[in-house]
Amino acid sequence: MRSTLPPPPLRVLIAEAHPIVVLGLADLLKTLGYMLVGSVASGPEAILAAGEHQPDLMLVDVDLKGEMDGITAAIEIHTRLGIRSVVLAEHCDRTVQTRAAEAALFAVLDKTSPVSAIADVLRAAPLRLIH
């Protein structure tokens, strides 16, 4: 008899400089049945944590602490480890969208988007990461 166990939960790492935003994202991930494997506040920390935790997906703010921005960190993580990112931007202007598109990141979301829009992107992640 074949086992019909559900697939393991999507493992997500958050790179975000604001703790209150991390809490909100963590709550959303829990609601969706995903597993938060860690959170960091800077680009270099994100690169190290991605190597350590090997998440399925990253949630990365454009404006991280320090000199490295989130898109640069996400590009480095994807190049080194093949891990894709959802980039969150307070102001999702054309420059952010263009840089993210050129880097083949998973998605770019404006932080002012409704929670339901962020949830929709995260719900689609397991299917899009496989293909």
Predicted regions and their residues:
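Two-component/phosphorelay signaling modules centered on CheY-like receiver
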Residues: 19-38
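Acidic, metal-coordinating helix/loop segments flanking the phosphotransfer/catalytic sites
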Residues: 39-57
